[in-house]
Swiss-Prot record:
Domain of life: Eukaryota
Coiled coil: none
Name listed for the protein in its UniProt record: U-Asilidin(1)-Eru1a
The species this protein was found in: Eutolmus rufibarbis
This protein's GO CC annotations: extracellular region
Signal peptide start-end: 1-23
Length: 51
């Protein structure tokens, strides 16, 4: 049973890490950018994330 708990803990850590990475991969509105993909739900216009 201990192995099962270890595996669940390991998966939880991986999920948390992936979510944290995804959250940091995009910039909020008004942030500096180069490509549209850098902005969360916005476009990159004049080097700034805009709606």
């Amino acid at each position: 049973m201990a192995n099962y708990i270890d595996v669940l803990s390991f998966l939880a850590i991986i999920c948390a890490t992936v979510l944290a990475t995804l959250a940091q991969d995009c910039s909020p509105e008004g942030a500096r950018c180069v490509h549209d993909s850098e902005c969360c739900f916005n476009e990159c216009i004049d080097s700034l994330c805009q709606p």
